[in-house]
């Protein structure tokens, strides 16, 4: 197995193992993390069936996080900074579309393309918007004002659908 990316999600052992965090930390450890050293806490959890509850536990912060990204992009000092933030925001937005998943969806999307494909199956009218963010996640090139307008519009739509 090749390790292609290392991220750090900071949390205490008690927080990770708390029953209230089973759908967030438990899911994340079981399905997305590989222990490189120390106690492998993922062994404490059974595999999780795909569900909207887990999507909300993991991405329920999408409105505040994406609003913060929009603000940071508008305040960016350099084009490099803005493009980096646009890429990050696009990736978060695409993954956050899981909060709209159907309980009948039987798979966890792994790639950004799979996230978009699943999303568009349920919301075909949003294909163009989803494809815009997929292109920005891969190779950001939109002007900051254009990007934040798209981001804020998609965010409002998503928030109205989550109810």
What positions do the PLM features span?
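Conserved nucleotidyltransferase catalytic core and NTase-mimicking acidic/glycine-rich helix/loop elements
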Residues: 41, 46-163
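Conserved catalytic core of two-metal-ion nucleotidyltransferases
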Residues: 1-37, 64-66, 72
């Amino acid at each position: 197995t090749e390790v292609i990316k290392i991220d750090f999600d900071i949390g205490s052992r008690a927080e990770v193992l708390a029953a209230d965090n089973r759908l967030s930390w438990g899911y994340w450890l079981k399905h997305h993390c590989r222990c490189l050293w120390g106690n492998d806490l993922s062994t404490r959890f059974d595999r999780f069936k795909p569900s909207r509850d887990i999507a909300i536990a993991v991405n329920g912060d999408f409105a505040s996080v994406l609003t913060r990204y929009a603000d940071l992009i508008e305040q960016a000092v350099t084009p490099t900074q803005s493009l980096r933030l646009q890429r990050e925001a696009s990736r978060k937005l695409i993954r956050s579309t899981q909060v709209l998943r159907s309980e009948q969806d039987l798979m966890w999307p792994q790639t950004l393309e799979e996230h978009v494909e699943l999303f568009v199956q349920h919301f075909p009218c949003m294909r163009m918007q989803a494809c815009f963010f997929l292109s920005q996640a891969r190779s950001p090139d939109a002007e900051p004002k254009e990007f934040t307008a798209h981001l804020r519009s998609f965010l409002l739509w998503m928030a109205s659908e989550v109810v």
